[in-house]
Amino acid sequence: MAEDDLCSLFFKLKVEDVTSSDELARHMKNASNERKPLIEPGENQSMDIDEEGGSVGHGLLYLYVDCPTMMLCFYGGSLPYNWMQGALLTNLPPYQHDVTLDEVNRGLRQASGFFGYADPMRSAYFAAFSFPGRVIKLNEQMELTSTKGKCLTFDPYASTQLRFEPGELVRHGECKFAIG
């Protein structure tokens, strides 16, 4: 099946030598900075700014889905409907060694009201996006409990515009949350 082949290829695509969320953030920031001249409009070019509030910088935002959905999104150039009004993203980095995948699923399920996050495999993959100005920060917060019992808070964001430009996708891969 083509989806399985794509998933096995996708599984092999990894960011080398990244062992922590700080390293991942640095790596993605560098990659984003390298791509910036390629994706920013040049002189006399128009820039498509969403009507809902103009350009707002949120840094990197992460989408969590399963591998087949991720592949369909990438080849289709659009985000999945994983929230009642569009796509739900968060500033929770995918390499949090002190948060379990089950806890991440619980937080995503609570923030989105989306039943699909009942299965941990539904969020085993991530895509990091840099969306200049076309996401809105939701009023809720995603509260997770770390493996050490510490409360961690992350912000959920929403995008009702599901199409994305190739330059907005910064990185993608398999999540590395804590086991157990």
Swiss-Prot record:
Function statement: Hydrolyzes cytokinin glucosides thus liberating free cytokinins.
Organism: Panax ginseng (Korean ginseng)
Protein's gene: ROLC2
One of the GO biological process terms: carbohydrate metabolic process
Keywords: Cytokinin biosynthesis, Glycosidase, Hydrolase
Protein's UniProt keywords contain Hydrolase: yes
Entries under InterPro entries matching the protein: Glyco_hydro_41
Example of a GO MF term: beta-glucosidase activity
Protein name: Cytokinin-beta-glucosidase 2
Top EC category: hydrolase
The protein's Enzyme Commission number: 3.2.1.-
